[in-house]
Amino acid sequence: MKKIILINLLLCSFIWALNIPKTSTFDKRIAYAIYNANDVFQINAKNGYVSVLEFGTDERIINTATGFAEGWDLIEKDNLLFIKPKAYKTQLVQQENNNIGESQASQEFVLDPNPHDWKTNLIVITNLNTYVFDLKLVNQNN
């Protein structure tokens, strides 16, 4: 029984491996990571800035998917993926019961990117690998 628990703990530790890319010694805004199929890579983005992911020169992006597509622009170009947070429009619908019956009122509003609501995942599939990312919006002063 102890062997089964130990094996399960070891397997779970690989599932939650988060790879925080190392920053360049020349410019802290540039970061890099070595691919490991068992890692989730963290990307910290800022509002008003474009981030770029560069994959191997022999890789081509086949597909991208994110859990919050309304809040992120993803632009693919060969082995490059450009990422930018964006505001999105949504509607608030309220139903009211009055003496006459039910009525609905809706109001459209824009939700600006913010660190609390803009956390999601990103999956990139290339012709060679599948990458999984944690996509986070960080404060401007980070």
Could you tell me what each predicted segment is?
Residues 4-13:
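Sec-dependent N-terminal signal peptides
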Residues 18-142:
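A general "mature secreted/periplasmic domain" signal
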